[in-house]
Amino acid sequence: MKKVHLGVIIAGAAVGLAALILTALGNPTNMGFCIACFLRDISGAVGLHSAAKVQYVRPEIIGLVLGAFIMSVASKEFKARAGSSPAIRFVLGAFVVIGALAFLGCPLRMVLRLGGGDLNALVGLIGFTGGILLGIASLKKGFSLKRSYEAHKAEGGVLPTVMAALLILVVTVPALFKFSEEGPGSMRAPFWIALVIALVVGALAQKSRLCMVGGLRDAFMLKDFHLLYSFVAIFVVTLVGNLAMGKFHLGFALQPIAHSAHLWNLLGMVLVGWGSVLLGGCPLRQLILAAQGNGDSAVTVFGMLVGAALAHNFGLAGNPDSKSEAGELIVGGISTAGKIAVVLGLVVMLVVVILNLPKKEEAKA
């Protein structure tokens, strides 16, 4: 087995194991890691939205960024670059998270949900794959957000600095932040344990180029499957772990923090897949790229934070399945505003692609 394959398998297995440990220690079920959900919690903690059930400074996000930053500096892979259509990336990042919160999970949580038996995530995977195929079609037509340029090191260090400052503030002045007393935001692993686990995962993700989108994109586009091994490793480890702990529950209805409104699970993840290909990586990959000096990815992460806040300020996020007092299933889903936002996001993706295709003169050249 090639060394690169072994590296991505180890990284994927570590992510799966870390997710199981974090869930066992208090994180929500099938949500050991979720980039979209955890960014949403942070946006609530700093006051960008007022949804009381989803507010917490998630140490997992801080750890992922700082772990990747430390690894990139240690391996001399930290390179400050920026200038590749930052405003467009901000908007795309916002819509990617809106799509993820319609589904109730980023691509990483989608895999974790599959490993827990949640078949709604299979619907999400179909949509995610469809979105990636749309992204590949866009790339083959010549779509590009143009090149980035070498930048000052201070530019590349923006997100690691923000995360380090956030860590210092939450430890020394926790009263500055809002913390959920019920709901998903109140379900959390011990802070320092979660931080240390995330530091390790961030370092491994940086070194292995771990990306939930990259595996499927490269498999379809280049017949290169090595990144896909990490995707499979995460699934296998979480599946085996959940089976061993009696946490595997196969089905659609009443899955943890999930809904069975299939159309919107599918379309939400189409939006995530398409947007992630256009951006050059999934939400996890954007965190890692920003940590190793990519200013454009940092802008994307800030867009994701704003998108998460918008999703809860305007009621765009999905609502989980529930039971009535009579014990009948109440299928969750998204509001009319959420449906409009997902469709609008798909339209925005299309417009961005069209406006960033090569002009006839460029194509001839």
Short names for language-model regions:
Residues 1-365:
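Membrane-interfacial helix-loop segments of redox and metal-homeostasis proteins
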